[in-house]
Amino acid sequence: MPDLTNKTDEQLAKQCQQGSLDAFEELVKRHEARLFNFLCQKAPRREDAEDLAQHTFVNAWQRIGQYRTEASFATWLYTIARNLTISHYRKHGKVIHCELEVAEPTLVERETPADTLSETEEHAALWRVARETLKEEAFDVLWMKYKEQLSIAEIATVLSRTEVSVKVMLHRARKKLGHALENSSDQESDSNTHPEPFPNLNKQIAFAHGGTTCSV
């Protein structure tokens, strides 16, 4: 099998359109973990997230001829995934989420390698607060921006929204998350019996209010 690791997503997608299963397998390897974590924020059970991820890739393969490289492959893939989750909600409703798999953070400021574990756990805890605090679409905007690093234009494509509305949602989501984190800090400061859940809270609040130093 030829080495496909140096190909871009878009180059691989073009090979898929010519019938290359090897190219599609490479795309699955690149995106399956992050897509699963995205779907874990939406599906009622881990098994449902796994099923949705599988259906997303099946749909992507079946519709690969419709993909246009003007948009990134990730944007196109997340559009399919989000549409499938909407159908899932209509059938089953939304109950408790499956647990987010703690993966290496995308945007983390590390001081020493020893900080990695605690900061990764903190990173997952921050996203749990976001999930509990924000409405579905607001959470999606925040996730796609900071976890998936999609552009405003790409997020707008996934959500079928204007770029202006995405910017407004992002601003409001950051502000609301900042207030939630501040409240968490206030509650913990009143108790001496529990360890502080967010040791880097000041950086996180700075992010949520518009700063750039955050672990999401």
Predicted regions: what is each one?
Residues P2-L4, Q15, V129-E132, T157-V158, ...:
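C-terminal edge and immediately downstream basic/flexible tail or linker adjoining helix-turn-helix-like DNA-binding
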Residues N6, H88-R110, L117, D186-D190:
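Short, basic/polar amphipathic helix motif occurring as a linker/hinge flanking DNA-binding modules
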